[in-house]
Each structure stands twice: as C-alpha cells, then as structure tokens.
A protein has these predicted regions:
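Conserved thiamine diphosphate
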Residues: 1-42, 48, 82, 290, ...
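Short glycine-enriched loops at secondary-structure junctions
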Residues: 1-3, 122-125, 249-252, 325-328
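Short, glycine/polar-rich helix-capping loops at beta-to-alpha or helix-loop-helix junctions
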Residues: 1-5, 127-129, 148-152, 173, ...
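Short secondary-structure boundary/capping segments
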Residues: 3-7, 59-64, 135-136, 179-181, ...
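Acidic-glycine-rich active-site phosphate/pyrophosphate-binding loop
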Residues: 5, 243-258
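Glycine/charged-rich beta-loop-alpha catalytic/anionic-binding loops adjacent to active sites
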Residues: 10-18, 219-221, 254-267, 286-292, ...
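Flexible, low-complexity linker and terminal segments
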Residues: 19-226, 231-235, 240-244, 248, ...
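Thiamine diphosphate
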Residues: 257-394, 405
Length: 463
C-alpha cells in the first residue's frame, strides 16, 4: 500500500526509471546520472518495497571516474517570473526529446512469446509476470516508465491478440495506453490495492496459483513490537494509563499504536507531532490541552521538530511535548544524529543540548525523566499537563539495542506468588507470555529492565 510516486514524475515532467531487480537497481542508477547530464534534468529512480527489501548477486562493472568541473553561475536557473517562462519552454522541449528517446532505448524492451496475449508491465510486476506466464505471453517491459513511448506501445499492441497491463497501484500505464488509442485490460482484472504477487496475478486472471513452498522449520510469527527493554515502553504505558490523546511521529515509537498499549492516535510525517499538537490544542482549547501530548524521537526532533516547538513557545500554546531521547536513530539502523555527539563516521562531533535548546526557543518548563521509572514518568506527565504553559518532558534512556548498553540479567518468576492476573502483560513486552495461568519470561529476550516488576503487585517478578 505504498504511495504511487509515479505521479511525481508526471506532475514534474521529469523522467522516471523503475528497476525490477537488484542488478537493474545498480544499472538504472548509473543511467539516471547519464540521462540527467544529457538532458539537463532531474531523474527519479523509483524503488518499490520489494526491490528495496530483496537481494541478489550483481555484476558491478568497472568504476568510472568523473572529472570535476568548475562551477558556472547561471542566473536563469533562479525561478523568478521572467526565468520561469523560459524554463517552461525548456521543460516541454526536454519532454519531447525524452519521449523520442523512450521509443528507442533498451530500457524499454519487448520480449516476444505467445502472441495470443501481450502484457505491458514495469518494476517488480515484471518479475511476477515472467514467473506466472513464462513464454505463454509476450511482454513489453517499461524500464523508463515516464515519459512512456507511444509508437512502441502501438506497435506492440498490433502484434498481439489481447493486451493486458499489469502494474501495482494506480492505472498509470493503462491510462496512457487508452489516451493514445490503444485498447487494454487492466484494473478491471488486476487489483489496485496492496502489492501484487505471483499468486495475486494468477488468481486475478482465473489461473491456478503455484502452491507456496512451506519451510521445514515452523518459525513463529513476529508481529511489529517494540524490543524487550525498549525505553519507549514505559512512556506509552503511562500515556495510555492517563488516557492521553497522543500525536505521534516517525520512529520506533510509532509502534506505540500496537496492542496492548494502543497509545497512539495520530501519525503523519516527520515533525508533524509538535506542530500538529499546537494546532489541535488551539482548535480544541482547554478541553483538549489537559490530556493531549506530542511524542517525537531525538533524531526526528533534530530533523524537523524544532520549528514546531518554536511555534508552540512563540504562541504560548498550552502544549506538552515529550522528546523520546534514546541516544540514537533507532528505527533505520542506529545512525548518529546531532543529539548523539558523533557524526555518521562515528567520530566526535558537536552535540545539541536538548534542554538548552528547548529553553532557548522559549520553554521555561523543561524536565528530564527516566522512562523506566514508571512512578516518576507518571508524576512528570500529570504535572506538565496541569501546568498553564508550554512544557517539555525529555524521556532519556539509551536504546537497549546499542552495543554500549549493558544488559542486566534476565528476570525470573516466583510461580508461587504469580496468580496470572496479567497486569505485567499490559506493557506489551515480547519477553513476557502467559503459559497456562502463570507468566513466563523468555530469558533469551529479557534484558532485566524491571519495568514489568513495577507492574506486579505480588512481587512475583524477581531480578
């Protein structure tokens, strides 16, 4: 259900390349730079989910060194009114040239098979088509998906009895074919929602899908969940307990929406939590201010949260923002950021002082809390929501997956004291499970954070 970014190429009138495997991802990136230089244009290389998450052996080829060129000033590239009109002419001329190129380039290729059925496709859908049909259909593969060829499509259509477009999401190729007078089948057969697979395509066309090959080992499912010992867990438990409206942001903490926490109410894009909360509270007034918060990670805050809290402070919005400082950019693979004190190479670098920054933009109420201390977290949240001014709570504890973080020994369960009440299960830790009427701790996952111990009223969980 990813966005169909092909629309951007059409709206901006810039070429788009769509690789269908790992090798093409490499080759098309090279071609993108070549086309950019030749046609003086940005080029989009569209990577869909399956291409990005797949891997295969690639042939690298010989590295080409590009000589540096002197920078030359060109005031016509500044889009003032007088220049924008000239630029529009250049864009239209470039589009005509790129369309002519699309007719002859090897990026768009025809693979003739049985002529009873012709299929036009692109991206990962091409791989599914080849797996389902093999030589039982002729295929026009569009590696350059915008601008699309006109004559090439018409010529291909003339060589087959029936023409079908197989593409994920929107009917963009299908609509193009109809606009140039080529009759095709498309979304009346192929789903518009969710990603395609070999099975989806086969069943959509009334064919029998190949059976899945089952793994010999029965691997248990792994639903999206915050890691055992994640410092965000105590924050979201506290927010859920206090029935807060939580405006989320982009990061591991987006998983706060998952059960049993069910703590997140809104999530749009990086930085939207702070400015969104500000607008929400301005619109809702005092009724909303006392139970609404924004949550944003330290790296997302450095990326685009600072302007949002500046707006809150400047307008004296009675809003509470929680900055979840786990000392790293967690979700995308532990990259450094301006709050960690190291650059992307791991070298010492300047470090943003979050408390000082928040005070500098106008917050008088700034406090730091350890999120694994549930009582302290609850106290801080209640006090800041009750305050009649903007406030910041910095939830500070390193990501448990950092190599520098020492894990405590796993906890144990006193089975004589445990009555299976399930209170500890409310934090949603993957190291905890109910086996029969008793709680069980997975010692391979437990990092001894002791958050669950604070939930147990019978002292049944022990370090």
């Amino acid at each position: 259900n990813e966005q169909d970014s092909r629309h951007y190429a059409i709206a901006a009138k810039v070429p788009m390349l769509e690789p269908s495997d790992s090798q093409e991802a490499l080759e098309f990136t090279k071609r993108a730079f070549q086309l950019s230089e030749e046609y003086h244009t940005p080029v989009i290389v569209r990577m869909c989910t399956r291409i990005s998450h797949s891997q295969s052996i690639v042939t690298k080829g010989v590295r080409q060194e590009v000589p540096k060129r002197a920078y030359v000033k060109d005031p016509e590239r500044v889009m003032m009114t007088v220049n924008s009109l000239k630029a529009h002419y250049r864009v239209e001329e470039r589009t005509r040239a790129m369309t002519a190129f699309s007719e002859t380039t090897e990026l768009n290729r025809v693979e003739m098979g049985d002529t009873a059925l012709g299929i036009i496709t692109s991206s990962t859908s091409y791989q599914y088509v080849k797996e389902v049909f093999g030589d039982r259909a002729s295929v026009l593969k569009l590696g350059l998906s915008w601008p699309m060829p006109v004559e090439k499509i018409k010529n291909f259509a003339a060589q087959v009895d029936q023409l079908l477009v197989i593409e994920e999401l929107e009917p963009i190729i299908e609509n193009h074919c109809r606009q140039i007078g080529v009759e095709v089948m498309g979304k009346e057969k192929i789903p518009m929602v969710d990603e395609l697979t070999q099975g989806v395509i086969a069943r959509s066309l009334g064919q029998e899908a190949k059976p899945w090959v089952r793994l010999e080992e029965d691997i248990p499912g792994r639903p999206p969940v915050m890691c055992a010992g994640c410092p965000h867990r105590g924050v979201f438990y506290t927010l859920a307990k206090n029935k807060c409206m939580v405006y989320g942001d982009i990061g591991c903490y987006t998983l706060g929406v998952m059960p049993p926490l069910n703590a997140l109410d809104l999530n749009i894009c990086m930085g939207a939590s702070c400015s969104g909360l500000h607008g929400f509270n301005l619109a809702g007034g005092a009724e909303h201010e006392k139970h609404s918060v924004a949550v944003i990670g330290d790296s997302t805050f450095a990326h685009s949260g600072i302007t949002g809290i500046a707006d809150i402070a400047y307008n004296r919005s009675n809003s509470t923002v929680l900055i979840l400082d786990n000392s790293i950019t967690g979700m995308t693979g532990h990259q450094q950021n301006p709050t960690t004190g190291r650059n992307l190479r791991g070298e010492p670098a300047g470090q943003i002082d979050l408390e000082a920054l928040c005070r500098a933009v106008g917050f008088d109420r700034v406090r730091v809390v350890d999120p694994n201390d549930l009582k302290a977290m609850d106290k801080a949240l209640k006090e800041e929501l009750a305050a009649e001014e903007p406030s910041i709570i910095i939830s500070r504890r390193p990501c448990v997956m950092l190599k520098s973080v020492k894990k405590a020994p796993p906890l144990t369960v006193d089975l004589d004291k445990c009555n299976g009440c399930g209170l500890c299960m409310k934090i949603g830790c993957p190291a905890l499970s109910l086996r029969g009427e008793k709680v069980e701790i997975d010692r391979t996952q437990c990092v001894g954070c002791q958050v669950c111990m604070q939930m147990c009223h019978r002292d049944a969980l022990l370090p």
